[in-house]
């Protein structure tokens, strides 16, 4: 871990801020299988060949072996975490760990209040499918009421603990236990699909209310190690929760599915290490909760991380999280907030410069990956997105098919966009720009929106114009405007 990077940042934000690791922090050690690299990538069969070439060219052109390198203002890379640094989502996986083990520190009388946090009143009666085969729809407020009532029963039985417990046969047979898990995970999906991301992204972090940062870190690290281990929870399968039919509730039964498995591949570990070995700093900018991300950096031994900015809630006087986002530190680290957080927290350490490399996968990363003038290269993990991430996927394929390399793109004032595919059924990269999504048999490529962007570029539109004409994010400041 680059201690200078941490010290520089702590000088800007107080020592109790998002970058003070949990007490259990130890220096990151790199997996033995990841070699020391200078200006070249190993594992070439597992990187898409155009991606491999682009990254190598980036290191050669902007790393410390380049004659143009100035170490007084080091270039830096900014990585999203979920579905970018990692395959699949660490916080969604932690939610399953929490629910199965009832790892909460919320008082039973406060649970309903916590679950209501941030949800606009006019959205409480919003409905979402129960997905139990009945075709019925369920009100958000009814599911919240049920989950809070279930929690009181489970808490009274002594099954709720901060660290969580291995579920017993008695717990598994409990109707309230079954319903609580189903309603909580259903709410996560329902809120995410029916409300703005500024509501849904922080909502799941309020589950840590009552915990200290170190308690969240330790809980998350245990989850990461379990679901990142192919002999344990890393099954690359889908599971589901279903409410029982023999429990009287306001919402009635619901069913919800979830994914099992997370990893950080040897190729991604290598990329972090390669960048650092060539004088390029690396940062994480994530919409997951900050302690959850810090724990993942350690659990997966990600080398050379200079800093983490992520979702952070306020602490009470006893040092425990409350259900309130800490805007005093920075904006929510999603969408526009990822860019403003770079401007507030990271760029001042680099004389105001933006990231030279951006790594992303989805709508929440679109702003920071396209708005900064200093960004030379954008690495996109293909999930066949239909949101604004489809725009950059379409640009990447246009540049690839027209043999536009890094030097040419940068000379034209553009970033080079690179599209990397992967196999989510076994947690690996492969030499393809297509992705096999979890549970699917056929690969996914470009969404209709991405194909539209590629077509418009073929007709002669500029990258700036296709972004402006196709983006749905009204807060996007424009291509290379920061």
Positions of PLM-derived features:
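Short amphipathic, positively biased membrane-proximal segments
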Residues: 1-3
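Non-catalytic pre-domain segments flanking phosphatase-related domains
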Residues: 5, 9-81, 89-128, 132, ...
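C-terminal cap/substrate-recognition subdomain and adjoining C-terminal extension
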Residues: 33-46, 50, 56, 60, ...
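N-terminal low-complexity, Ser/Thr- and acidic-residue-enriched intrinsically disordered segments
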Residues: 80-81, 86-89, 166-167, 365
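Solvent-exposed coil/turn segments that connect beta secondary-structure elements
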Residues: 82-84, 90-91, 313, 383-385
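A metal-dependent, Asp-based hydrolase signature
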Residues: 91, 98-100, 105-255
């Amino acid at each position: 871990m680059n201690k200078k990077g941490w010290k520089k940042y702590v000088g800007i934000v107080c020592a109790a801020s998002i970058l003070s690791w949990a007490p259990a922090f130890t220096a990151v050690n790199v997996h033995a299988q990841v070699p020391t690299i200078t200006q070249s990538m190993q594992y070439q069969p597992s990187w898409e060949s155009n991606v491999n070439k682009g990254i190598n060219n980036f290191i050669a052109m902007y790393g410390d072996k380049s004659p143009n390198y100035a170490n007084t203002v080091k270039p830096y890379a900014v990585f999203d975490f979920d579905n970018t640094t990692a395959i699949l989502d660490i916080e969604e996986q932690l939610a399953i760990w929490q629910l199965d083990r009832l790892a909460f520190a919320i008082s039973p009388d406060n649970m309903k209040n916590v679950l209501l946090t941030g949800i606009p009143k006019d959205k409480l009666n919003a409905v979402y499918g129960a997905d139990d085969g009945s075709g019925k729809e369920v009100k958000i407020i009814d599911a919240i009421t049920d989950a809070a009532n279930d929690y009181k029963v489970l808490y009274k039985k002594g099954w709720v603990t901060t660290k969580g417990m291995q579920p017993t046969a008695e717990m598994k047979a409990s109707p309230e236990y079954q319903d609580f898990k189903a309603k909580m995970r259903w709410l996560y999906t329902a809120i995410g699909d029916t409300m703005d991301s500024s509501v849904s992204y922080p909502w799941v972090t309020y589950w840590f209310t009552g915990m200290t940062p170190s308690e969240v870190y330790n809980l998350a690290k245990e989850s990461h190690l379990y679901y990142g281990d192919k002999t344990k929870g890393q099954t690359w399968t889908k599971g589901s929760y279903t409410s029982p039919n023999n429990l009287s509730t306001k919402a009635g039964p619901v069913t919800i599915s979830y994914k099992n498995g997370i990893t950080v591949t040897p190729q991604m570990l290598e990329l972090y290490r390669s960048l650092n070995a060539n004088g390029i700093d690396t940062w994480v900018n994530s919409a997951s909760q900050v302690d959850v991300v810090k724990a993942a950096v350690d659990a997966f031994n990600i080398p050379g991380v200079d800093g983490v900015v992520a979702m952070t809630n306020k602490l009470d006087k006893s040092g425990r999280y409350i259900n309130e986002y800490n805007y005093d530190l920075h904006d929510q680290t999603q969408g526009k907030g990822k860019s403003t957080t770079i401007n507030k927290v990271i760029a001042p350490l680099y004389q105001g410069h933006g990231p030279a490399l951006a790594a992303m996968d989805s709508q929440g990363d679109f702003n920071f990956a396209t708005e900064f003038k200093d960004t030379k290269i954008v690495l996109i993990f293909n999930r066949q997105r239909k949101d604004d991430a489809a725009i950059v996927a379409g640009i990447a394929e246009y540049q690839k098919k027209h043999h536009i390399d890094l030097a040419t793109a940068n000379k034209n004032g553009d970033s080079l966009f690179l599209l990397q595919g992967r196999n989510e059924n076994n947690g690996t990269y492969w030499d393809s720009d297509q992705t096999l999504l979890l549970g699917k048999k056929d690969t996914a490529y470009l969404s209709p929106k991405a194909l539209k962007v590629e077509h418009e570029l073929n007709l002669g539109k500029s990258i700036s114009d296709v972004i402006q004409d196709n983006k749905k994010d009204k807060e996007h400041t424009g291509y290379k405007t920061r």
